Amino acid sequence: MQIFVSLTSWDGLSELTLFSDFSGFMDRFYVGIENYKEILTSKEFYQVIGNTLEFVILYIPLMLIVSMIVALILNSHVKGVGIFRVLYYIPVITSWVAGALIWKWVLSPEYGAINNILALFGIEGPSWLQSSKWAMPAIVLASVWKDMGYFGLMLMSGLQGINQEYYDAAAIDGAGKIKQFTRITLPLLTPTLFFVLIISLINSFQLFTQIMIMTPDGGPLGSTMVMVERIYKCGFRYYEMGTAAAYSWILFAILLLLTMVQMKLQNKWVNYDD
């Protein structure tokens, strides 16, 4: 498909994929908006949207909390932070293939490390990746592990941009660490948090590699089938290029809408004052 597109004058809005029923090597036929009607009236689409939103809702808050903790540790001067600064970025530079295989082993119900630790406390761990209830939370856990160093580094740069004089003045006024964090750190860090929120939202909708390795074929009962995996399967497994392209445009529209909403709402909570 990509070779075919590269040999055409394709502007992304032509009938080649957007309004075509194209199967790769056969003649294409104009079908209008039938691809979109088929998608929007199918049960699979709403399951895919639901799974994707479940990941987003679980992933983004947890990722922000963990990344903030990482950033605060990196920005501190406690003993041993030098070792942490070396180790925290290892998941980021580890390929998703290797990382997903590691997590597949860690989450194994027979010999996985997590269930073995739970067994020490008399808790019977679930079959993480074989359960429709726990498969998506397991994917979220692995994704946070992979991304916390990347977003933690961004937040650390934001922390280092805050003038130390604010903290000194607050300390003189008797403000404790918690009040300094809520009244100084968080408000002045909102521009960085806003950027991280947009990037992480787009990143979460592009969920693919860890899904394909940890829970192939959509996971148990299709519980981890997400948008990008559906696009891949429609295009390169079923050779329904028109349907795959329609899914891609729907994904683009969703991301564009969510980004516009975030840009519109930023004035209500993002503080750009120095």
Where are the regions that the model predicts?
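A structural signal for multi-pass alpha-helical bundles of membrane permease subunits
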Residues: M1-D274
